[in-house]
Amino acid sequence: MKIPEEEFLAPGHRGCAGCGATVGVRLALKVLGKNTVAVSSTGCLEVITTPYPETAWEIPWIHVAFENAAAVASGVERALRARGRGEVNVVAFAGDGGTADIGLQSLSGAMERGHNIIYICYDNEAYMNTGIQRSASTPYGASTTTSPHGKESFGEDRPKKNMPLIMAAHGVPYVATASISYPEDFMEKVRKARDIEGPAYIHLHQPCTTGWGFDPSKTVELGRLAVETGSWILYEIEDGDFRVTYRPVQRKPVEEYLNAQKRFRHLTEEQKAKIQEYVDSVCQELRI
């Protein structure tokens, strides 16, 4: 795939060095192009790209509350359709907190109503903007400020909420997982989401140097390691048909992924083995 050179998210924003969210937005907008309206919930992306009166967005962009990105996007889509502008792409960007927790109700409603929108969850696996608090998307064992490791807790003790399958259960015509570290896979999924009639949901895994604890130069490497260990699986569900879009030639031990991040360094060998066992069971089910 030839990646277009034109940018719709300008440089000079205030993202952390190594920020994965901005990489994802840049790639998505290269596919969607100028004829696009973006909606962003409160979160990292909004804070770093639009400190008043500045903006990094080169397309129409709307900032909304933490919980209603999908609701506003659905309203924008209906308004454009009423004005005879149904060809305009409407995309919502929200973090895992604004998707799996606070915004789940409005997202569910928008998907169920069948609005022709694309919803992209940029998942850094915690509320990074407000201080690295755990979310429903925080993986088992990770240490956050609200699920810390210590005498009374070893870190997050709940499994990661499976948002893609929840969206698939709504009958959404196109659901996919993606990673910023596999740009061609992600961009092809954005293209499919754009071209399909009806709602589309993409769950984008994006390493966070600040919240995960790794060198900013390792963002892409960490994203690849998540996929190569089976900790994050790339797939799509198109009209109910499930398909894995990338299979590692030989899966690496999950320990390589865990050891590369500060948020997992407290885990014992026994706890790491438990996580490996879980990953193995999921991968075996999907024949990865």
From Swiss-Prot:
UniProt temperature dependence: Optimum temperature is 80 degrees Celsius.
Cofactor: [4Fe-4S] cluster
EC class of the enzyme, as a word: oxidoreductase
Designated name of the protein: Pyruvate synthase subunit PorB
Biased composition (Basic and acidic residues): 149-159
Biased composition (Polar residues): 137-148
Catalysed reactions, semicolon-separated: 2 oxidized [2Fe-2S]-[ferredoxin] + pyruvate + CoA = 2 reduced [2Fe-2S]-[ferredoxin] + acetyl-CoA + CO2 + H(+)
EC number: 1.2.7.1
